[in-house]
Amino acid sequence: MSKLDGFIEEHDRESNIDSGARLESTKPSPKVGSPAQRVRQNGVKSPILQTQATPAKPSEQEHPLKETPTRATAGGKMTRSNTLKRLSLIQPVISPETTPKEHRQQQATRNRSRSVVSVHSRSSSSASEQLADATKDVNALLQLLANKELELLETKHKIEELKKTLTQEEKALLRQTHELQDLKTQVGKALNSGIDEQIQQQSQSSHHSPNQRSLAVPTSHTPGNESRPAHAKKESVWTKPLSFLNQFDQLIQHELEKKLNWDDVASPEKTPGAESGTLSGRSASPASYNNGNSNNNNNNNSNRGRPNEDVLGNMSSSLWSFVSDVKTGLLGINEEEEEESAEAPAVASSGESNNQLRFVGSKNNSEVELKEYNASKRQ
């Protein structure tokens, strides 16, 4: 026993107060307390990890400051009020019993449940945060998906529009190619029609002048005619008047032979002078023909003024002068053109100069020269 307990017992004896019963009645029921509560055991303070016990509210009867009537002693003496003050100063120390093992196990399970609940609350909060983040991520992914689908639709529309434009361009290209082919055919027809017309004109001119083919001299060996196709075209223009001139010359010669009674002379043939006239006259112009006609008219007028001594001689001289003037005029123009164009062969010019016929002398000598010329030709 401690000194304090002995002092309390002595005081109870003196004051005739049983404080032990009051202490037993004031024992609180064991409750769960905090683990930091300190308990006195045998006067030694030692920390014990124990649940904190909340003291119960004392009743009015158990309150230490309550005024309780003191019992009268045998001597009839009254106790002093100081005792009450002393009792109020001395607080009863309650030493609660240790908690049993079952209570400790229950407390541990409760703590565990609390810790589990706290952990669950923390995990639930983190899970809720994760769920919120996941929902946010899902929304973002859905938005991206929608945007991608819209982009794909736009690209598909663009591709369809490009295909439509491509088909339209292809149709336009085909139409243009058909138009080009039509134009080509039209141009070909126009050119062919022009060529056909030229061929027809040439064929008609060849039919109208059959004597030219028989009287024409082959000039395929001459390099001048091969190098100048334009000159050949110009010659073909004068084929008709030259053939007419050749026929006129033959008629004149035939009439002269009839009037002169040249029976021993053969039928009139084409003289070298006429051939030279036809060859040289191909490149002649109508101006030379007009000049020849004018010269012939002048000669005829001059011959008319002369005295008509012999009608036959006058006729023959006038005719042969006309022929000679025409031939010399044609040959002179041909020589000028040959001088301008240096591509003409020298052989053709020499042949033309050799084939010239000149009737020099009076009206009586012309017949003799013509007979000599025919005799030399037959030899």
From Swiss-Prot:
Residues 39-54, 211-225, 354-365 have a biased composition (Polar residues). Residues 1-16, 59-69, 366-379 have a biased composition (Basic and acidic residues). Keywords: Coiled coil, Cytoplasm. It comes from the Eukaryota. Residues 114-128, 200-209, 283-305, 343-353 have a biased composition (Low complexity). Signal peptide: none annotated. Residues 1-133, 197-235, 263-313, 332-379 are annotated as: Disordered. Residues 125-190 form a coiled coil. It is found in: Cytoplasm. One of its GO terms (cellular component) is cytoplasm. Pfam families: TDA11 (PF17084). Belongs to the TDA11 family. This is Topoisomerase I damage affected protein 11.
